[in-house]
Design a protein with these regions (language model features):
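Short, solvent-exposed amphipathic alpha-helices that sit
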Residues: 1, 81-85, 110-130, 145, ...
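Short beta-strand segments enriched in small/hydrophobic residues
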Residues: 1, 26, 71-73, 99-108
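Short beta-strand elements in bilobed, periplasmic/extracellular small-molecule ligand-binding domains
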Residues: 1-6, 100-103, 122-143, 243
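Solvent-exposed loop/turn segments at secondary-structure junctions
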Residues: 6-10, 33-36, 58-62, 95, ...
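Hydrophobic alpha-helical segments within soluble ligand-binding/sensing domains
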Residues: 12, 72-99, 143-147, 194-199, ...
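Hydrophobic alpha-helical
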Residues: 13-47, 119, 137-202
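Flexible loop/hinge segments that line or gate small-molecule binding clefts
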Residues: 36, 41-80, 196-204, 208
């Protein structure tokens, strides 16, 4: 069974409880809600003999405690991925100290927010000023609703030279946002995460200049392998860093 949570932590918790009640052999989860919120449900699941593992966003405390019971992680080192993208994007976009960059992310979320914090730190280390906006719930679940917020941010800060969107859906929507703000493909440098077909189109069209590919297929595939290995052979949790490489128009 598969549950779609719209990237909403409260929905994830509700669906996780529902999944545990079905008593499957194993469950692969996202770590968006954080260790504290997920701990009681995971404890209940383990008492029922259900194997748990994570993908995309880690639960580092629980992973450390339950690794011998099959609790692994398939995903990027989030802070490092954000930090590396932030620095590389400044370089690729040709920004200088004192320039402004817009970072649109999820810094308030436990664990998941580390990627946004990393991106901000990477940009700031290069001497670039950050204008930050938190992605609201409605935009987090439906990137098409982000256009007014993007346009408003640029209206208030017309000297912003780069946008980093810490969200695959928002990164794919950068061309739409930029066109709505009246920007041509060479006016604002676009950066973000993941490598979907729309993002490839955005790179080829010039609206997206650099992304970091986190290999989401691997993030989804390996946790299922993990559950099989643990339920069948009792293997411990595996940790896989999927934050692979930067992608630009030069190597697409």
């Amino acid at each position: 069974d598969y549950y779609w949570s719209q990237w909403n932590s409260e929905i994830m918790i509700k669906q996780f409880k529902e999944a545990v009640a079905l008593q499957p052999d194993g469950i692969a989860i996202y770590g968006f809600p954080g260790d504290a919120a997920m701990r009681p449900i995971i404890k209940e699941a383990r008492e029922m003999g259900i194997v748990i593992t994570t993908m995309n966003t880690p639960l580092p405390d629980l992973e450390a405690e339950l690794k011998t019971e099959g609790f692994g992680y398939a995903g990027a080192d989030l802070f490092a991925a954000g930090f590396n993208l932030g620095k590389k994007a400044v370089e690729v976009c040709g920004l200088s100290a004192g320039d402004k960059a817009f970072v649109w992310g999820l810094a308030s979320m436990p664990n998941r927010g580390e990627r946004t914090k990393g991106a901000i730190a990477g940009v700031e280390e290069m001497g670039v000023e950050v204008v930050y906006q938190e992605i609201p719930d409605n935009v987090n679940s439906d990137a098409s609703q982000g256009t007014p917020m993007y346009v408003a941010t640029y209206s208030a800060n017309p000297d912003i030279k780069m946008a980093i969107t810490d969200h695959g859906g928002l990164t794919a929507s950068l061309p739409t946002y930029m066109k709505a703000a009246g920007h041509g493909s060479e006016e604002v440098c676009g950066a973000g995460f993941d490598l979907s077909a729309p993002i490839v189109d955005g790179i080829n069209s010039g609206y997206i200049d650099i992304v970091i590919d986190q290999q989401p297929f691997i993030q989804g595939y390996m946790p299922i392998v993990q559950l099989y290995l643990t339920t069948k052979f009792g293997m411990a949790g595996l940790a896989m860093d999927t934050g692979a490489a930067f992608v630009t128009k030069a190597n697409i």
